[in-house]
């Protein structure tokens, strides 16, 4: 948690002005079938608190698609500690777990504490508990930390509520209509990383969450840059003739893959970030682009038109023949591999429709996850439970969320421009 606090604090030091036109999660499908849970409003033991911690925890669990927190007006009681919970009152509503908590002012901030209480199996027992001493600006972070711990205790899956998303917003006019922004996963605490008069594309997070690689056209042609979030430093890593695009950091943090067309067709290259040495991975007259890494940091999945239409292939970065991965649909592109390497998500086109699909890399089974319009650029949460992507809505582009089982759906509408190229951060 200390490393995460250090990274997040560096963001706050550099970008203290939070934008007003933030994206916010609006759930559109799936929460009604999720597991009911009680998240009692946290008790304040010393005056008003600037953030309602219980509401943030409830929103996190609801946004996961796996829980459906009941409305406080339906709660049989509103206890502040495990000792005050009456298990039978909750199980009568079909609720087998309740979260209670307190927020106590301190000399320089707040003490936030929570308890997760079992109301059925071992009625009244505390399944998880913790407390966090934070300043005012870290109250939301404390709430997300509690959510992560509760989520993992109840599901066995690591929570991802302290992660961030990066995305590009094209605003209407102005000197710098293109902005690369970063926000908490739920759209709060949004800030601008970089403004540009020319298009920005394809942000990619470094393995430790401290840097973003992206494509810029500020020099008059495409270039790949890496920006350090703590100090804003920008380093150009590729600006070859013709196309430079699709950057992707390796999971071990040592390499950056990207696509170049300096020799004619698009091909994949990998840069060793320690030495700066660039090696070519694919070669030929077909177009090979949109690399994404397998967990071993030695293998890439990518889009290629070597069979005529775009499909997903994989290849080792040290040589070998490519292997085709996708066979369903007229074309498949823009894939991302899950952090455990068990599945990929991609943009799949069939019969004129363009949706986000998931392919099991063991069985080969494919599931279409979305029903939105002209879906693009999917990015998977680090725990593999959710996908963020952009789609067309009306005349603009918005961000959408879908669970990797396809049951839960939500959108993150923005009010000040078109939003594209979402990228979900690693754990922070």
UniProtKB/Swiss-Prot annotation:
InterPro entries: 6-blade_b-propeller_TolB-like, PD40, Tol-Pal_TolB, TolB_N. Residues 1-21 form the signal peptide. Keywords: Cell cycle, Cell division, Periplasm, Signal. It comes from the Bacteria. GO terms for cellular component: periplasmic space. GO terms for biological process: cell division; protein import. It is found in: Periplasm. Pfam families: PD40, TolB_N. The Tol-Pal system is composed of five core proteins: the inner membrane proteins TolA, TolQ and TolR, the periplasmic protein TolB and the outer membrane protein Pal. They form a network linking the inner and outer membranes and the peptidoglycan layer. Part of the Tol-Pal system, which plays a role in outer membrane invagination during cell division and is important for maintaining outer membrane integrity. TolB occupies a key intermediary position in the Tol-Pal system because it communicates directly with both membrane-embedded components, Pal in the outer membrane and TolA in the inner membrane. NCBIfam families: propeller_TolB. PANTHER family: PROTEIN TOLB, PROTEIN TOLB HOMOLOG. Belongs to the TolB family. This is Tol-Pal system protein TolB. The lineage of its organism: Bacteria, Pseudomonadati, Pseudomonadota, Gammaproteobacteria, Enterobacterales. The gene is tolB.
């Amino acid at each position: 948690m200390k490393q995460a606090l250090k990274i997040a604090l560096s963001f706050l030091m550099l970008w203290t002005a939070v934008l007003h036109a933030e994206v916010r999660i609006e759930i559109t499908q799936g929460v009604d079938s999720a597991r009911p849970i009680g998240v009692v409003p946290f008790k304040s033991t010393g005056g008003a608190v600037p953030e309602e911690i219980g509401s943030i925890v409830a929103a996190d669990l609801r946004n996961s698609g796996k829980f459906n927190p009941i409305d406080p007006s339906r709660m049989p009681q509103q206890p502040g500690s495990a000792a005050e919970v009456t298990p039978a009152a909750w199980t009568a509503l079909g609720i087998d777990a309740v979260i209670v908590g307190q927020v106590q002012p301190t000399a320089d901030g707040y003490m936030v504490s929570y308890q997760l209480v079992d109301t059925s199996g071992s009625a009244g027992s505390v399944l998880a508990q913790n407390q966090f001493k934070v300043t005012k600006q870290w109250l939301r972070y404390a709430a997300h930390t509690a959510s992560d711990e509760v989520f993992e205790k109840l599901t066995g899956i690591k929570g991802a509520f302290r992660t961030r998303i990066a995305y590009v917003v094209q605003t209407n006019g102005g000197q710098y209509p293109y902005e690369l922004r970063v926000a908490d996963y739920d759209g709060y605490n949004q800030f601008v990383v970089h403004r540009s008069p020319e298009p920005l594309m394809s942000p990619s997070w470094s393995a430790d969450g401290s840097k973003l690689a992206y494509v810029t056209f500020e020099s008059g042609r495409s270039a790949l840059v890496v920006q350090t979030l703590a100090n804003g430093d920008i380093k150009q890593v590729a600006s070859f003739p013709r196309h430079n695009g699709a950057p992707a950091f390796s999971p071990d943090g040592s390499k950056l893959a990207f696509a170049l067309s300096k020799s004619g067709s698009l091909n994949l290259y990998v840069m060793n970030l320690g030495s700066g040495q660039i090696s070519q991975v694919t070669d030929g007259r077909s177009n090979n682009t949109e690399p994404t890494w397998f967990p071993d940091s030695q293998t890439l999945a990518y889009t290629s038109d070597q069979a005529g239409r775009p499909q997903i292939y994989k290849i080792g970065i040290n040589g070998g023949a490519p292997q085709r991965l996708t066979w369903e649909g007229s074309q498949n592109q823009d894939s991302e591999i899950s952090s455990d390497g068990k599945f990929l998500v991609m943009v799949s086109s069939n019969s004129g429709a363009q949706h986000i699909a998931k392919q099991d890399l063991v069985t080969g089974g494919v599931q279409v996850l979305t029903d939105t319009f002209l879906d693009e650029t999917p990015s998977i949460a680090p725990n593999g439970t959710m996908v963020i992507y952009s789609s067309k809505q009306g005349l603009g582009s918005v961000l959408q969320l879908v669970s990797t089982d396809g049951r839960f759906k939500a959108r993150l509408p923005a009010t000040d421009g078109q939003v594209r190229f979402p990228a979900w951060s690693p754990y922070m």
